Regions:
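Secondary-structure boundary motif
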Residues: 29, 132, 160-164
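Phosphate/diphosphate ligand-binding glycine-rich loop within oxidoreductases
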Residues: 34-40, 48-159
């Protein structure tokens, strides 16, 4: 597996859940696995739990983390091809991904849907451009359409706490006055199908 951008990137999801539970129960078992390796964490949107849990997991594996908050630090990136860069973008993703790949052994990205243009959001512009132009694996920390790390964590919780082989699982989506991203719900539904719950 080169990238972990979607649940489908895991060849055996149930096995991955079992391995994750075993690792959770012995979180420092592989504490030297990432020695002399770096995880670049790129945030185009804020994060609390995903950011902390990913940094802690990296630390437990012996990885160093390098964090960039792209809306507050660094240059605004351009994602379109053939565009004259004389506006607010000072760096093209093609060059940025190549540079970050030189310093990091993996790149984790969090880039929400804009909720302005569904077609553009569904194209996963940020995630797919980094996957295209980087030379290292990409990890999705939540994108416009998917949040595989959250779905993996949800699968762990279900497996650890279920009292029957097929527990009743309900996903509730409440009305909200403003548009909300659907990445978590999308990945949750796919995960439930994969664990046959």
């Amino acid at each position: 597996m080169k990238d972990f951008m979607y649940l489908e990137d895991l060849p055996n999801f149930k096995k991955s859940v079992s391995e994750a539970i075993a690792l959770k129960n012995n979180s420092l078992k592989f504490n030297s696995l990432g020695q002399n390796k770096a995880l670049g964490m790129l945030f185009f949107n804020p994060s609390l739990r995903t950011r902390l849990s990913t940094q802690k997991a990296a630390q437990n594996l012996g990885l160093k983390t390098m964090v960039m908050n792209f809306n507050d630090e660094g240059w605004k990136l351009e994602f379109g091809n053939g565009i004259e860069m004389n506006g607010t973008s000072s760096e093209h993703v093609k060059e940025a991904a190549a540079v970050i790949s030189q310093y990091c052994d993996m790149i984790a990205i969090r880039a929400f849907a804009s909720l302005n243009d569904k077609k553009t959001d569904e194209s996963e512009l940020v995630l797919n451009n980094f996957a295209r132009y980087s030379s290292v694996p990409i990890i999705n920390m939540e994108s416009a359409t998917a949040h595989p790390l959250q779905a993996l964590a949800d699968a762990i919780t279900i497996k650890e706490h279920k009292t029957s082989d097929r527990p009743k699982i309900v996903l509730t989506w409440a009305p909200h006055p403003k548009p909300l991203p659907h990445a978590v719900a999308n990945s949750f539904i796919k995960m439930v199908k994969k664990i046959n719950a």
